[in-house]
Amino acid sequence: MKSVNRRQSLRMLGAALLAGCLMTGGRAQTQGSDVKPVNKSSREKIAERHLPNVTLTTQDGRKVKFYDDLIKDKIVMLNFFYAKCDGICPGTTANLVKVQKLLGDHVGRDVFMYSITLKPEQDTPAVLKKYAEAYKVGPGWTFLTGDPKDIELLRQSLGFTNPDPALDAVKSQHIGMLRYGNEPRQWWAGCPGLAHASYIVKSFGWAVGLPKAGKEAGQ
């Protein structure tokens, strides 16, 4: 029962982080009108509000749609970063390499990892490819860049924000957290990117409905 409560609390946290601001389905018709309201599922609402289908480019130069190609029907883990970061980016990336190793062959099969640059003007696909190679990133982990406006839309839609406008404008404020989720089941949660790798794997597994990932990694 204790583990069930923990799982439920993680998913409730994810719902608050990602979907808590969703608007409820409103009435589309006015008095005297025969126009019927359009009822959308909660999954459609989350995708529409928090998972914009912008075009991004991978470290290999491949064009992809964020929702259609990277998120839909998948279990994912994602974070924001930038290559020339002297703060916590290097430590976070190195920690996620450990996470990837603990998850083993789940990555690229059941789980997909994404790191999105906050400085797309600097981080070209070639820069991202070199960065991934420097950290010996394995298959199933994709680095992404794109149009600055699309990156900013993603950042805000995914909830990597600060209520203080001055702090929100500082890119380094948005590189310390991970967001992970099971898109078809609408389970979302998150944790600090510098948390112990085994903790991330265990929390991730419970949150997205993949507890075997942590057990198989020896957690």
Predicted segments, located by residue:
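Thiol-/selenol-based redox modules, centered on thioredoxin-like
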Residues: 167-219
